[in-house]
Amino acid sequence: MRRLTFACVSCLVVLAGYAADRFSDDFSHGSDQWIIEQQPGGSVTVHDGVLAIDDAGGCTVWYQPKLVAPVVVRYEARVLSSGRVSDLNCFWMAGDPRRADLFAPGHGRDGKFASYDTLRTYYVGYGGNENTTTRFRRYDGTGARPLDPEHDRRAPQFLLKPDHWYRIELLATAEGHVQFSRDDEVIFDIQDPAPLREGWFGIRTVHSRIEVRNFSVSSPAAPAAGR
């Protein structure tokens, strides 16, 4: 794991569940706000306002501050055609019940997907399995991988287009309203009876080349009202 210094105190975004100010990262200061967990053979770099992940065996890049619901995460991302077009994935509201600090020494995560089995988190695998599936799961920290049929999308309109900049939006409220939206279309809309009210956001991929830009975190404009 590469832990990178959180240098910008004024960029603290969540206090008592609400954004003090909208936070955005144009990556002009590099990857100072991010923590990288990656298997050997890959790299994470920043250039021209873009966070670039070139991966071989598995990579998660975490936004360092903890998020507290209600929260909206927005970013733009694409999968490059110069690599394997698959796995534009993300965790949000992720936490490890064994430790209050996700990044405390001894967490054991190394970029391999199995090393994340202890997390409680919302997860979308967008264009997974060689770009044949897009799935939402709520992991419970036991290693189980539950999948509701309505959260398993296989139609072409839900899969990745190479080199296309997607606008991704993630929502989580304290009441359990959870959404994953892409290009202003809600793909998954969930009411969680046991909400994950705090945790971390991470971008994930494996054996692909992805780019991320225009990252932001804020509160919803108004309280979300269920599904």
For each feature predicted by the language model, list its residue ranges.
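Bacterial N-terminal signal peptides that target proteins for export
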Residues: 1-8
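Enrichment for repetitive, rod-forming helical segments
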Residues: 9-10, 184
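Hydrophobic h-region of N-terminal signal peptides that target proteins for export
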Residues: 10-19
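Extracellular glycan-recognition regions
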Residues: 18-227
